[in-house]
Amino acid sequence: MLKQLRPALVMIVSLTVITGLLYPLGMTGIAQVIFPANANGSLIEKDGTIIGSELIGQGFTGDRYFHGRPSAAGQNGYDAASSGGSNLGPTNPKLIERIKADATALSQDEGSARPPIDLVTTSASGLDPHISPETAFYQVPRVAKARGIDEAALREIVEQQVEARELGFLGEPVVNVLKLNLVLDRTSTK
């Protein structure tokens, strides 16, 4: 019996050390050397203080800022510890009511009849940092008015912040809301 148990225990300990310790430490070390910013969460600093990550959405309020997608992560949204969608199906009355209410409020706030889908639907993670370029352009009149910026100049800033498809063919062009708002803060002083 001991003759059969020993190889099993050696295998368990060996694989635990290899897959639970050596492999993760090796990959972390390689990532730190090759992609240090990415390996540490793609953090964004302002005046020496970490204010967010390129990879995790944040809630922005007020007319001076572009708004991201709504978040279902956590009680008040944008809670990275509670990442996840609302789990409401497309025919769920609560989801339909929320989308209609959000669409109505956005139509009144933005002065436009129909808001883009990005502004009324959550992402699967609830923490999507990106919106479509169309969604950013939809918000230009409100942000331009609040900041006292010419709409054409603001559209140009948005154009500069559009990130192309990954590898030229994966996904759709997107705008990172945090990075766009930081560019606005640097260029606008009103």
Swiss-Prot record:
This is Potassium-transporting ATPase KdpC subunit. GO terms for cellular component: plasma membrane. Keywords: ATP-binding, Cell inner membrane, Cell membrane, Ion transport, Membrane, Nucleotide-binding, Potassium, Potassium transport, Transmembrane, Transmembrane helix, Transport. Its main location: membrane. The chain crosses the membrane at residues 10-30. Part of the high-affinity ATP-driven potassium transport (or Kdp) system, which catalyzes the hydrolysis of ATP coupled with the electrogenic transport of potassium into the cytoplasm. This subunit acts as a catalytic chaperone that increases the ATP-binding affinity of the ATP-hydrolyzing subunit KdpB by the formation of a transient KdpB/KdpC/ATP ternary complex. The system is composed of three essential subunits: KdpA, KdpB and KdpC. Signal peptide: none annotated. It is a single-pass membrane protein. It comes from Brucella anthropi (strain ATCC 49188 / DSM 6882 / CCUG 24695 / JCM 21032 / LMG 3331 / NBRC 15819 / NCTC 12168 / Alc 37) (Ochrobactrum anthropi). One of its GO terms (molecular function) is P-type potassium transmembrane transporter activity. NCBIfam families: kdpC, PRK00315.1. Belongs to the KdpC family. It is found in: Cell inner membrane.
